[in-house]
């Protein structure tokens, strides 16, 4: 008599396939996360209230960049493309040589991760979905705000530079550092974010803003 049910066997096969895919992502990724060349930016001097207002009005963007996740015994490096339209988004995560990729599409209350046209998974939050399917702890809901250089709704502690750029933030158990900004049109936007939460460290590079 088999000690593993059909459902358990199917679940093990799915997890095994995901593990293989993640291994491909790790092998094909770069060994270091390189920063884009520093462009010359003329920063805008504003009050924090005005800067927050301008940044909070940005609700559509196309971003491409790279990120790394460091946790005990494992380091993940990958590239990404993030398309945002209002509260709807589509994020493609892929290896440097495009050997492996996943697509995440979401709207409030519904997030789907696609590993192939026929293989997809759903959850109510992106954090839940990525933890279940990829084993990653990424505060994607809050990153919607943090990548614009503003806090997410809720309590926070923050530090600012002389231009009132957000340079350090503590929120929802995360410590975030904004080490570079770049001028895009009439606003200054982050280029690098460093996040930490206990033993977990995440670095996000935003190479191009549109």
Curated annotation (Swiss-Prot):
CDD domains for this protein: LolB
Presence of the UniProt keyword Transport in the record: yes
Localization per Swiss-Prot or TrEMBL: Cell outer membrane
Annotated signal peptide: 1-29
Gene name linked to the record: lolB
Pfam families found in the cross-reference section: LolB
Subunit structure, as described in the record: Monomer.
Keyword flag Signal: yes
Task performed by this protein: Plays a critical role in the incorporation of lipoproteins in the outer membrane after they are released by the LolA protein.
Protein source organism: Coxiella burnetii (strain CbuK_Q154)
Taxonomic superkingdom: Bacteria
Record's GO cellular component terms: cell outer membrane
InterPro entries: LolA/LolB/LppX (IPR029046), OM_lipoprot_LolB (IPR004565)
Keyword terms: Cell outer membrane, Chaperone, Lipoprotein, Membrane, Palmitate, Protein transport, Signal, Transport
UniProt protein name: Outer-membrane lipoprotein LolB
Membrane topology value: Lipid-anchor
GO biological-process terms attached to the record: lipoprotein localization to outer membrane; protein transport
Family, similarity comment: Belongs to the LolB family.
Predominant subcellular localization, coarse grouping: membrane
Lipidated residue numbers (N-palmitoyl cysteine): 30
Residues with lipidation of kind S-diacylglycerol cysteine: 30
């Amino acid at each position: 008599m088999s000690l593993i049910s059909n459902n358990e066997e199917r679940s093990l096969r799915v997890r095994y396939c995901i593990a293989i895919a993640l291994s491909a992502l790790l092998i094909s990724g770069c060994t270091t996360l390189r920063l884009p060349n520093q462009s010359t930016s003329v920063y805008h001097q504003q009050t924090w209230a005005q800067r927050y207002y301008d940044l909070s009005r940005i609700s559509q963007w196309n971003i491409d960049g790279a990120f790394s996740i460091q946790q005990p015994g494992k380091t993940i490096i990958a590239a990404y493309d993030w398309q945002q339209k209002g509260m709807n988004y589509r994020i493609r995560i892929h290896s440097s040589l495009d050997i492996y990729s996943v697509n995440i599409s979401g709207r409030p209350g519904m997030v789907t991760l696609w590993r192939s046209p026929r293989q997809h998974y759903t959850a109510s939050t992106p954090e839940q979905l990525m933890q279940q399917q990829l084993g990653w702890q990424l505060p994607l809901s809050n990153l919607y705000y943090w990548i614009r250089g503003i806090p997410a709704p809720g309590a926070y502690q923050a530090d600012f530079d002389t231009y009132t750029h957000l340079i350090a933030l503590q929120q929802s158990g995360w410590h975030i550092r904004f080490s570079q900004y770049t001028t895009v049109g009439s606003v200054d936007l982050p280029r690098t974010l460093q996040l930490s939460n206990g033993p977990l460290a995440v670095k996000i590079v935003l190479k191009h803003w549109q």
